[in-house]
Amino acid sequence: MSTTRSKGLHALQRWRSFGEDRAALARQLALRAVAEATAAVAVVQDRAQAAREQRLGLLQSPLLDLTRLTASAGMEEAAWRDVQVCQQRLQHAEDDALVAREQHETAHRMARAVAHRATRVVAIERDAAEKHVFDSLVELRGRPRGGPHD
């Protein structure tokens, strides 16, 4: 085995490690986006629930003001549309997080495969070098002493 092969594998190993680090960062960012989207859904749902309670309060009041009731119903409807939008964003963020997780796992497997291969190649090269040294010593000891040397 040549050291060129192990150097190439080490370069590939560094590249795959870099890819794994990038995939891990993308996964962390995707998880952060999911957490932020979840928090946004909770906030918007609280607002929509407050708008619903306000509208119900207006309906239960002894004096019914249609203008305020219509405005309150419009605000509640807009709030529930915002909830739907935030839930869609959350779903997209969860889908992106799933894709990021799969990409990170793939990058991790690829990096490990190259690392194992590089370890095997280095061991093979080390064994070949030891065998070469041993063969050289055997050859040197096998030459007759005092005779002509090449």
Task: Describe these PLM feature segments.
Residues M1-D150:
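Charge-rich amphipathic alpha-helical interaction elements
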